[in-house]
Protein backbone atom coordinates (compact mmCIF):
# COMPACT_ATOMS: atom_id res chain seq x y z
CA UNK A 1 0.00 0.00 0.00
CA UNK A 2 1.46 3.35 -1.08
CA UNK A 3 1.51 6.14 1.47
CA UNK A 4 0.10 9.49 0.44
CA UNK A 5 1.61 12.69 1.80
CA UNK A 6 0.10 16.18 1.98
CA UNK A 7 3.18 17.70 3.57
CA UNK A 8 4.62 19.78 0.71
CA UNK A 9 6.42 22.66 2.41
CA UNK A 10 8.14 24.50 -0.42
CA UNK A 11 8.29 24.69 -4.22
CA UNK A 12 11.22 26.42 -5.96
CA UNK A 13 11.46 26.16 -9.76
CA UNK A 14 11.48 22.45 -10.66
CA UNK A 15 12.08 21.40 -7.02
CA UNK A 16 9.57 20.49 -4.32
CA UNK A 17 10.27 19.78 -0.63
CA UNK A 18 8.17 17.17 1.22
CA UNK A 19 8.37 16.58 5.00
CA UNK A 20 7.43 13.68 7.29
CA UNK A 21 8.30 10.96 4.78
CA UNK A 22 9.31 7.38 5.65
CA UNK A 23 11.31 4.76 3.73
CA UNK A 24 11.95 7.03 0.73
CA UNK A 25 15.01 6.29 -1.42
CA UNK A 26 17.21 8.35 -3.74
CA UNK A 27 16.08 8.39 -7.42
CA UNK A 28 12.66 6.94 -6.52
CA UNK A 29 9.79 7.84 -8.85
CA UNK A 30 7.17 10.21 -7.42
CA UNK A 31 3.55 10.81 -8.43
CA UNK A 32 2.07 14.23 -7.67
CA UNK A 33 -1.72 14.67 -7.72
CA UNK A 34 -2.84 18.29 -8.13
CA UNK A 35 -6.04 19.61 -6.56
CA UNK A 36 -7.57 19.48 -10.07
CA UNK A 37 -6.86 15.74 -10.31
CA UNK A 38 -4.02 16.23 -12.81
CA UNK A 39 -1.11 13.82 -12.30
CA UNK A 40 2.53 14.88 -12.62
CA UNK A 41 5.74 12.95 -12.11
CA UNK A 42 9.04 13.58 -10.42
CA UNK A 43 11.97 11.80 -8.83
CA UNK A 44 13.69 11.98 -5.45
CA UNK A 45 16.87 14.04 -5.62
CA UNK A 46 17.80 14.08 -1.95
CA UNK A 47 16.69 12.50 1.32
CA UNK A 48 17.63 13.98 4.69
CA UNK A 49 15.95 12.31 7.67
CA UNK A 50 12.20 12.66 7.14
CA UNK A 51 12.62 15.32 4.44
CA UNK A 52 12.75 14.60 0.69
CA UNK A 53 13.66 16.88 -2.20
CA UNK A 54 11.68 16.01 -5.35
CA UNK A 55 12.62 17.06 -8.88
CA UNK A 56 9.49 17.68 -11.00
CA UNK A 57 9.39 16.55 -14.63
CA UNK A 58 6.43 18.66 -15.81
CA UNK A 59 7.20 21.87 -13.94
CA UNK A 60 5.73 23.32 -10.76
CA UNK A 61 3.15 25.78 -12.13
CA UNK A 62 -0.21 25.48 -10.35
CA UNK A 63 0.98 23.42 -7.37
CA UNK A 64 -0.94 24.25 -4.18
CA UNK A 65 1.07 23.51 -1.02
CA UNK A 66 -1.99 22.54 1.06
CA UNK A 67 -3.98 20.40 -1.38
CA UNK A 68 -1.26 18.61 -3.38
CA UNK A 69 -0.94 14.85 -2.73
CA UNK A 70 2.45 13.15 -3.12
CA UNK A 71 2.97 9.38 -3.55
CA UNK A 72 6.41 7.72 -3.58
CA UNK A 73 6.19 4.72 -5.92
CA UNK A 74 9.15 2.71 -4.60
CA UNK A 75 10.81 2.27 -8.02
CA UNK A 76 13.07 4.38 -10.26
CA UNK A 77 11.99 6.01 -13.52
CA UNK A 78 11.44 3.24 -16.09
CA UNK A 79 10.66 2.86 -19.76
CA UNK A 80 8.60 0.06 -21.31
CA UNK A 81 10.58 -1.48 -24.17
CA UNK A 82 9.61 -3.64 -27.14
CA UNK A 83 10.75 -4.26 -30.72
CA UNK A 84 7.56 -2.45 -31.75
CA UNK A 85 9.33 0.81 -30.82
CA UNK A 86 11.17 0.69 -34.17
CA UNK A 87 9.55 3.11 -36.59
CA UNK A 88 7.98 5.19 -33.81
CA UNK A 89 8.45 8.73 -32.44
CA UNK A 90 8.32 9.39 -28.68
CA UNK A 91 8.61 12.49 -26.52
CA UNK A 92 11.49 12.98 -24.10
CA UNK A 93 9.81 10.84 -21.44
CA UNK A 94 9.08 7.89 -23.72
CA UNK A 95 5.41 8.66 -24.47
CA UNK A 96 4.20 8.18 -28.10
CA UNK A 97 4.29 11.47 -30.03
CA UNK A 98 3.28 10.23 -33.50
CA UNK A 99 -0.46 9.67 -32.83
CA UNK A 100 0.21 5.93 -32.88
CA UNK A 101 -0.99 3.44 -30.24
CA UNK A 102 0.75 2.99 -26.91
CA UNK A 103 3.54 0.41 -26.89
CA UNK A 104 2.73 -2.88 -25.14
CA UNK A 105 6.05 -3.39 -23.36
CA UNK A 106 7.88 -6.69 -23.32
CA UNK A 107 9.53 -5.49 -20.11
CA UNK A 108 10.13 -2.33 -18.11
CA UNK A 109 13.72 -1.17 -17.57
CA UNK A 110 15.34 1.34 -15.21
CA UNK A 111 16.53 4.22 -17.42
CA UNK A 112 19.78 4.53 -15.45
CA UNK A 113 20.95 1.19 -16.81
CA UNK A 114 23.61 -0.96 -15.20
CA UNK A 115 27.35 -0.41 -15.15
CA UNK A 116 29.21 -2.63 -17.61
CA UNK A 117 31.95 -4.71 -16.01
CA UNK A 118 35.18 -3.67 -17.83
CA UNK A 119 36.19 -7.35 -18.06
CA UNK A 120 32.92 -8.09 -19.90
CA UNK A 121 33.67 -5.52 -22.61
CA UNK A 122 34.74 -6.64 -26.08
CA UNK A 123 37.23 -4.46 -27.98
CA UNK A 124 35.66 -2.45 -30.85
CA UNK A 125 37.04 -3.75 -34.15
CA UNK A 126 34.40 -3.66 -36.92
CA UNK A 127 34.11 -0.86 -39.47
CA UNK A 128 30.87 1.14 -39.70
CA UNK A 129 30.33 2.77 -43.09
CA UNK A 130 28.67 6.18 -42.81
CA UNK A 131 28.96 7.02 -46.51
CA UNK A 132 30.87 10.21 -45.59
CA UNK A 133 34.45 10.23 -46.92
CA UNK A 134 35.90 12.53 -44.24
CA UNK A 135 34.73 10.04 -41.59
CA UNK A 136 35.09 6.67 -43.37
CA UNK A 137 38.42 7.42 -45.01
CA UNK A 138 40.20 9.49 -42.36
CA UNK A 139 38.40 9.30 -38.99
CA UNK A 140 36.85 5.87 -39.17
CA UNK A 141 33.91 4.96 -36.92
CA UNK A 142 34.19 1.49 -35.33
CA UNK A 143 31.32 -0.60 -33.94
CA UNK A 144 31.09 -0.04 -30.17
CA UNK A 145 32.92 3.30 -30.27
CA UNK A 146 31.76 6.65 -28.88
CA UNK A 147 32.72 9.38 -31.36
CA UNK A 148 31.29 12.87 -30.70
CA UNK A 149 30.71 15.65 -33.23
CA UNK A 150 31.89 19.09 -32.04
CA UNK A 151 29.86 21.72 -33.87
CA UNK A 152 29.06 25.40 -33.46
CA UNK A 153 25.92 27.48 -33.46
CA UNK A 154 24.55 27.76 -37.01
CA UNK A 155 26.68 24.94 -38.45
CA UNK A 156 24.85 22.10 -40.26
CA UNK A 157 25.18 19.40 -37.59
CA UNK A 158 21.52 18.46 -37.84
CA UNK A 159 21.91 17.66 -41.55
CA UNK A 160 25.04 15.63 -40.74
CA UNK A 161 23.19 13.74 -37.98
CA UNK A 162 20.33 12.90 -40.35
CA UNK A 163 22.78 11.79 -43.05
CA UNK A 164 24.64 9.44 -40.68
CA UNK A 165 21.36 8.01 -39.34
CA UNK A 166 20.16 7.40 -42.90
CA UNK A 167 23.36 5.93 -44.37
CA UNK A 168 25.21 4.12 -41.56
CA UNK A 169 25.64 0.34 -41.79
CA UNK A 170 28.01 -2.40 -40.64
CA UNK A 171 29.73 -4.04 -43.61
CA UNK A 172 29.92 -7.84 -43.96
CA UNK A 173 27.37 -8.47 -41.21
CA UNK A 174 24.01 -10.22 -41.26
CA UNK A 175 22.88 -8.72 -37.96
CA UNK A 176 20.11 -6.14 -37.99
CA UNK A 177 21.11 -2.47 -37.74
CA UNK A 178 19.01 0.03 -35.77
CA UNK A 179 19.28 3.74 -35.01
CA UNK A 180 18.14 5.31 -31.74
CA UNK A 181 17.92 9.08 -32.13
CA UNK A 182 17.63 11.37 -29.08
CA UNK A 183 16.92 15.05 -29.74
CA UNK A 184 17.50 17.11 -26.59
CA UNK A 185 16.10 20.63 -26.24
CA UNK A 186 15.59 21.22 -29.97
CA UNK A 187 13.21 23.70 -31.65
CA UNK A 188 9.92 22.78 -33.36
CA UNK A 189 11.59 23.47 -36.71
CA UNK A 190 14.45 21.06 -35.99
CA UNK A 191 12.06 18.38 -34.71
CA UNK A 192 9.99 18.68 -37.90
CA UNK A 193 13.18 18.45 -39.99
CA UNK A 194 14.30 15.23 -38.29
CA UNK A 195 10.89 13.52 -38.45
CA UNK A 196 10.42 14.51 -42.13
CA UNK A 197 13.97 13.45 -43.03
CA UNK A 198 13.63 10.05 -41.35
CA UNK A 199 10.15 9.48 -42.81
CA UNK A 200 10.73 10.45 -46.44
CA UNK A 201 13.97 8.45 -46.72
CA UNK A 202 12.51 5.34 -45.07
CA UNK A 203 15.17 5.47 -42.32
CA UNK A 204 12.40 5.63 -39.71
CA UNK A 205 11.60 1.94 -40.26
CA UNK A 206 14.82 0.95 -38.47
CA UNK A 207 14.83 3.88 -36.03
CA UNK A 208 13.43 4.91 -32.64
CA UNK A 209 13.12 8.69 -32.18
CA UNK A 210 12.96 10.52 -28.85
CA UNK A 211 12.09 14.23 -29.18
CA UNK A 212 12.55 16.62 -26.28
CA UNK A 213 11.59 20.13 -27.41
CA UNK A 214 13.01 23.42 -26.17
CA UNK A 215 9.57 24.26 -24.75
CA UNK A 216 9.47 21.04 -22.68
CA UNK A 217 10.59 21.20 -19.03
CA UNK A 218 14.36 21.40 -18.67
CA UNK A 219 14.27 18.51 -16.24
CA UNK A 220 12.98 16.23 -19.01
CA UNK A 221 16.23 16.80 -20.92
CA UNK A 222 18.10 14.92 -18.20
CA UNK A 223 15.90 11.85 -18.73
CA UNK A 224 15.74 11.87 -22.56
CA UNK A 225 19.24 10.52 -23.36
CA UNK A 226 18.81 7.84 -20.69
CA UNK A 227 15.49 6.78 -22.23
CA UNK A 228 17.26 6.45 -25.59
CA UNK A 229 20.24 4.53 -24.20
CA UNK A 230 18.03 2.11 -22.25
CA UNK A 231 16.10 1.38 -25.45
CA UNK A 232 19.41 0.90 -27.28
CA UNK A 233 20.66 -1.54 -24.62
CA UNK A 234 17.48 -3.58 -24.97
CA UNK A 235 17.75 -3.76 -28.79
CA UNK A 236 21.50 -4.49 -28.67
CA UNK A 237 21.93 -6.96 -25.84
CA UNK A 238 18.54 -8.70 -25.87
CA UNK A 239 17.66 -8.56 -29.58
CA UNK A 240 21.19 -8.83 -31.00
CA UNK A 241 21.08 -5.63 -33.08
CA UNK A 242 23.91 -3.26 -33.98
CA UNK A 243 22.55 0.00 -32.55
CA UNK A 244 23.80 3.48 -33.45
CA UNK A 245 22.77 6.08 -30.85
CA UNK A 246 22.81 9.70 -32.05
CA UNK A 247 22.24 12.35 -29.36
CA UNK A 248 21.86 16.04 -30.18
CA UNK A 249 22.41 18.47 -28.50
CA UNK A 250 24.48 17.47 -25.46
CA UNK A 251 25.03 21.18 -24.70
CA UNK A 252 21.29 21.52 -23.98
CA UNK A 253 21.54 18.52 -21.64
CA UNK A 254 24.39 20.19 -19.72
CA UNK A 255 22.45 23.47 -19.52
CA UNK A 256 19.55 21.56 -17.92
CA UNK A 257 21.99 20.03 -15.40
CA UNK A 258 23.26 23.53 -14.57
CA UNK A 259 19.70 24.82 -14.14
CA UNK A 260 18.77 22.05 -11.69
CA UNK A 261 22.08 22.40 -9.85
CA UNK A 262 21.48 26.14 -9.40
CA UNK A 263 17.94 25.48 -8.12
CA UNK A 264 19.41 23.08 -5.53
CA UNK A 265 21.89 25.81 -4.49
CA UNK A 266 24.87 23.52 -5.14
CA UNK A 267 28.38 24.97 -5.22
CA UNK A 268 29.06 25.67 -8.93
CA UNK A 269 32.13 24.45 -10.80
CA UNK A 270 33.65 25.84 -14.02
CA UNK A 271 31.36 28.32 -15.83
CA UNK A 272 28.58 27.56 -13.34
CA UNK A 273 28.22 23.91 -14.32
CA UNK A 274 28.00 21.43 -11.43
CA UNK A 275 31.25 19.91 -10.19
CA UNK A 276 29.97 16.45 -11.09
CA UNK A 277 29.51 17.29 -14.80
CA UNK A 278 32.34 14.92 -15.82
CA UNK A 279 30.87 12.05 -13.80
CA UNK A 280 27.37 12.71 -15.11
CA UNK A 281 28.48 12.78 -18.77
CA UNK A 282 30.39 9.54 -18.26
CA UNK A 283 27.14 7.83 -17.16
CA UNK A 284 25.87 8.53 -20.69
CA UNK A 285 28.97 7.95 -22.82
CA UNK A 286 30.15 4.82 -21.00
CA UNK A 287 26.94 3.02 -21.98
CA UNK A 288 28.43 2.48 -25.45
CA UNK A 289 30.36 -0.65 -26.30
CA UNK A 290 30.29 -4.37 -27.01
CA UNK A 291 29.90 -7.22 -24.52
CA UNK A 292 31.63 -10.60 -24.60
CA UNK A 293 29.16 -13.27 -25.70
CA UNK A 294 26.59 -10.76 -27.02
CA UNK A 295 26.06 -10.29 -30.73
CA UNK A 296 24.70 -6.74 -30.49
CA UNK A 297 26.56 -3.51 -29.79
CA UNK A 298 25.99 0.17 -29.04
CA UNK A 299 27.88 2.83 -31.00
CA UNK A 300 27.42 6.44 -29.91
CA UNK A 301 27.61 9.71 -31.83
CA UNK A 302 26.86 12.51 -29.35
CA UNK A 303 26.60 15.93 -31.02
CA UNK A 304 27.32 19.13 -29.11
CA UNK A 305 27.54 22.80 -30.03
CA UNK A 306 30.61 24.52 -28.59
CA UNK A 307 29.63 27.90 -27.09
CA UNK A 308 31.53 30.58 -29.06
CA UNK A 309 33.28 27.73 -30.98
CA UNK A 310 35.47 27.26 -27.90
CA UNK A 311 37.06 23.80 -27.69
CA UNK A 312 38.25 24.56 -24.14
CA UNK A 313 34.68 25.08 -22.89
CA UNK A 314 33.87 22.55 -20.12
CA UNK A 315 31.36 20.57 -22.23
CA UNK A 316 33.61 19.70 -25.23
CA UNK A 317 36.64 19.57 -22.92
CA UNK A 318 35.14 16.94 -20.59
CA UNK A 319 33.48 15.08 -23.46
CA UNK A 320 36.88 14.73 -25.13
CA UNK A 321 38.30 13.07 -22.00
CA UNK A 322 35.59 10.39 -21.92
CA UNK A 323 35.03 9.64 -25.60
CA UNK A 324 37.31 8.09 -28.21
CA UNK A 325 38.05 11.06 -30.45
CA UNK A 326 36.00 13.85 -32.02
CA UNK A 327 34.69 15.03 -35.40
CA UNK A 328 35.07 18.83 -35.59
CA UNK A 329 32.95 21.00 -37.89
CA UNK A 330 34.71 24.12 -39.22
CA UNK A 331 33.07 27.51 -39.67
CA UNK A 332 35.79 28.43 -42.18
CA UNK A 333 34.93 25.44 -44.42
CA UNK A 334 31.21 26.17 -43.98
CA UNK A 335 31.75 29.72 -45.30
CA UNK A 336 33.47 28.21 -48.36
CA UNK A 337 30.35 26.14 -49.07
CA UNK A 338 32.01 22.81 -48.25
CA UNK A 339 29.40 20.35 -46.98
CA UNK A 340 29.73 18.65 -44.58
CA UNK A 341 32.31 21.14 -43.22
CA UNK A 342 34.41 18.51 -41.40
CA UNK A 343 37.87 19.81 -40.44
CA UNK A 344 39.83 16.57 -40.80
CA UNK A 345 43.14 17.71 -39.26
CA UNK A 346 41.97 18.41 -35.67
CA UNK A 347 39.37 15.62 -35.93
CA UNK A 348 40.39 12.24 -34.55
CA UNK A 349 39.07 8.71 -34.18
CA UNK A 350 41.23 6.95 -31.59
CA UNK A 351 40.01 3.51 -32.67
CA UNK A 352 40.30 3.99 -36.44
CA UNK A 353 43.29 1.65 -36.74
CA UNK A 354 41.21 -1.19 -35.27
CA UNK A 355 38.47 -1.02 -37.90
CA UNK A 356 40.42 -0.74 -41.16
CA UNK A 357 42.67 -2.90 -43.32
CA UNK A 358 42.38 -6.18 -45.17
CA UNK A 359 39.13 -8.01 -44.49
CA UNK A 360 37.55 -4.90 -42.94
CA UNK A 361 37.90 -2.10 -45.51
CA UNK A 362 40.87 -2.54 -47.87
CA UNK A 363 44.58 -3.29 -47.43
CA UNK A 364 45.69 0.17 -48.63
CA UNK A 365 43.41 2.11 -46.25
CA UNK A 366 45.98 2.90 -43.52
CA UNK A 367 48.69 4.02 -45.96
CA UNK A 368 46.40 6.26 -48.03
CA UNK A 369 44.88 7.74 -44.85
CA UNK A 370 48.32 8.73 -43.51
CA UNK A 371 49.37 10.14 -46.89
CA UNK A 372 46.16 12.18 -47.29
CA UNK A 373 46.55 13.68 -43.80
CA UNK A 374 50.19 14.58 -44.49
CA UNK A 375 49.51 16.01 -47.96
CA UNK A 376 46.53 18.09 -46.81
CA UNK A 377 48.55 19.55 -43.91
CA UNK A 378 51.38 20.50 -46.29
CA UNK A 379 48.88 21.83 -48.82
CA UNK A 380 47.31 24.14 -46.23
CA UNK A 381 50.78 25.44 -45.31
CA UNK A 382 51.53 26.07 -49.00
CA UNK A 383 48.26 28.00 -49.41
CA UNK A 384 49.05 30.13 -46.35
CA UNK A 385 52.53 30.83 -47.76
CA UNK A 386 51.03 31.82 -51.12
CA UNK A 387 48.65 34.22 -49.37
CA UNK A 388 51.61 36.00 -47.75
CA UNK A 389 54.34 35.85 -50.42
CA UNK A 390 52.33 35.30 -53.59
CA UNK A 391 51.99 32.12 -55.64
CA UNK A 392 55.11 32.92 -57.67
CA UNK A 393 57.22 32.40 -54.52
CA UNK A 394 56.13 28.74 -54.29
CA UNK A 395 58.19 25.89 -55.68
CA UNK A 396 56.58 23.48 -58.17
CA UNK A 397 56.13 20.92 -55.40
CA UNK A 398 54.47 23.50 -53.12
CA UNK A 399 52.14 24.50 -55.97
CA UNK A 400 51.18 20.84 -56.39
CA UNK A 401 50.43 20.61 -52.67
CA UNK A 402 48.32 23.79 -52.77
CA UNK A 403 46.40 22.39 -55.75
CA UNK A 404 45.92 19.12 -53.86
CA UNK A 405 44.55 20.89 -50.75
CA UNK A 406 42.01 22.78 -52.87
CA UNK A 407 40.89 19.61 -54.68
CA UNK A 408 40.82 17.65 -51.41
CA UNK A 409 38.39 20.11 -49.81
CA UNK A 410 36.16 20.44 -52.87
CA UNK A 411 36.04 16.79 -53.95
CA UNK A 412 36.88 14.60 -50.94
CA UNK A 413 35.50 16.48 -47.92
CA UNK A 414 32.67 18.21 -49.77
CA UNK A 415 30.06 15.73 -50.96
CA UNK A 416 26.77 17.26 -49.84
CA UNK A 417 24.26 15.69 -47.47
CA UNK A 418 22.68 13.28 -49.95
CA UNK A 419 25.74 11.51 -51.43
CA UNK A 420 26.37 8.06 -49.97
CA UNK A 421 29.88 6.86 -50.87
CA UNK A 422 31.00 3.27 -50.38
CA UNK A 423 34.40 2.75 -48.75
CA UNK A 424 35.78 1.66 -52.15
CA UNK A 425 34.61 4.93 -53.73
CA UNK A 426 36.21 6.90 -50.87
CA UNK A 427 39.55 5.08 -51.16
CA UNK A 428 39.61 5.35 -54.97
CA UNK A 429 38.86 9.09 -54.72
CA UNK A 430 41.82 9.44 -52.36
CA UNK A 431 44.10 7.75 -54.91
CA UNK A 432 42.77 10.02 -57.68
CA UNK A 433 43.65 13.12 -55.62
CA UNK A 434 47.09 11.81 -54.64
CA UNK A 435 47.88 11.58 -58.36
CA UNK A 436 48.10 15.41 -58.31
CA UNK A 437 51.34 15.10 -56.32
CA UNK A 438 54.70 13.92 -57.71
CA UNK A 439 55.18 10.23 -57.05
CA UNK A 440 58.38 11.00 -55.12
CA UNK A 441 56.25 12.81 -52.50
CA UNK A 442 54.14 9.73 -51.70
CA UNK A 443 56.55 8.45 -49.05
CA UNK A 444 53.93 7.07 -46.67
CA UNK A 445 52.53 4.50 -49.11
CA UNK A 446 54.17 1.16 -49.78
CA UNK A 447 55.43 0.60 -53.35
CA UNK A 448 53.23 -2.47 -53.78
CA UNK A 449 50.10 -0.39 -53.13
CA UNK A 450 51.32 2.40 -55.45
CA UNK A 451 51.66 -0.18 -58.24
CA UNK A 452 48.31 -1.80 -57.50
CA UNK A 453 45.99 1.15 -56.80
CA UNK A 454 47.45 4.32 -58.38
CA UNK A 455 45.16 5.26 -61.31
CA UNK A 456 46.82 4.74 -64.70
CA UNK A 457 46.76 7.64 -67.15
CA UNK A 458 48.24 11.05 -67.76
CA UNK A 459 49.35 12.99 -64.70
CA UNK A 460 47.06 15.83 -63.80
From Swiss-Prot:
Keywords in alphabetical order: ATP synthesis, Hydrogen ion transport, Ion transport, Transport
One GO-annotated biological process of the protein: proton motive force-driven plasma membrane ATP synthesis
UniProt xrefs under InterPro entries: ATP-synt_VA_C, ATPase_a/bsu_AS, ATPase_F1/V1/A1_a/bsu_N, ATPase_F1/V1/A1_a/bsu_nucl-bd, P-loop_NTPase, V-ATPase_su_B/beta
GO molecular function ontology, one term from the record: proton-transporting ATP synthase activity, rotational mechanism
Pfam families for the chain: ATP-synt_ab, ATP-synt_ab_N, ATP-synt_VA_C
Matches recorded under CDD domains: ATP-synt_V_A-type_beta_C (cd18112), ATP-synt_V_A-type_beta_N (cd18118), V_A-ATPase_B (cd01135)
Family: Belongs to the ATPase alpha/beta chains family.
Function comment: Produces ATP from ADP in the presence of a proton gradient across the membrane. The V-type beta chain is a regulatory subunit.
Record-given protein name: V-type ATP synthase beta chain
Organism lineage: Bacteria, Bacillati, Bacillota, Clostridia, Eubacteriales
Gene of this entry: atpB
